[in-house]
Amino acid sequence: MGCCGCGSCGGCGGRCGGGCGGGCSGGCGGGCGGGCGGGCGSCTTCRCYRVGCCSSCCPCCRGCCGGCCSTPVICCCRRTCGSCGCGYGKGCCQQKCCCQKQCCC
């Protein structure tokens, strides 16, 4: 039920306005194997479940600890986000980007 038929990869919480060309390369069986080629369109929510995985509409994530920013930009939580007080396991980025050393929630 994802934005580009990649529900297993998280998809998009909202709508994918720009249309996702190739979607997630690799089929998204158990997560995006090689990541997505590039970000697509405009997404309202993007989620990255593990390092190297990205949703069908979110730019590739690296070093994520549970979530991407809720804006279509390349910025993900770092593993040190647990000390930011933004929540652990569910991603520390709720509305803004997570910096390399601290969250900007």
UniProtKB/Swiss-Prot annotation:
GO cellular component assignments: intermediate filament
Keyword Repeat set for record: yes
Keywords: Keratin, Repeat
Annotated spans, 14 X 2 AA repeats of CG: 4-87
Note: Human have a similar number of genes as other primates despite the relative hairlessness of humans.
Stated family: Belongs to the KRTAP type 28 family.
Function comment: In the hair cortex, hair keratin intermediate filaments are embedded in an interfilamentous matrix, consisting of hair keratin-associated proteins (KRTAP), which are essential for the formation of a rigid and resistant hair shaft through their extensive disulfide bond cross-linking with abundant cysteine residues of hair keratins. The matrix proteins include the high-sulfur and high-glycine-tyrosine keratins.
Protein known as: Small cysteine and glycine repeat-containing protein 4
Organism (species): Homo sapiens (Human)
UniProt gene name: SCYGR4
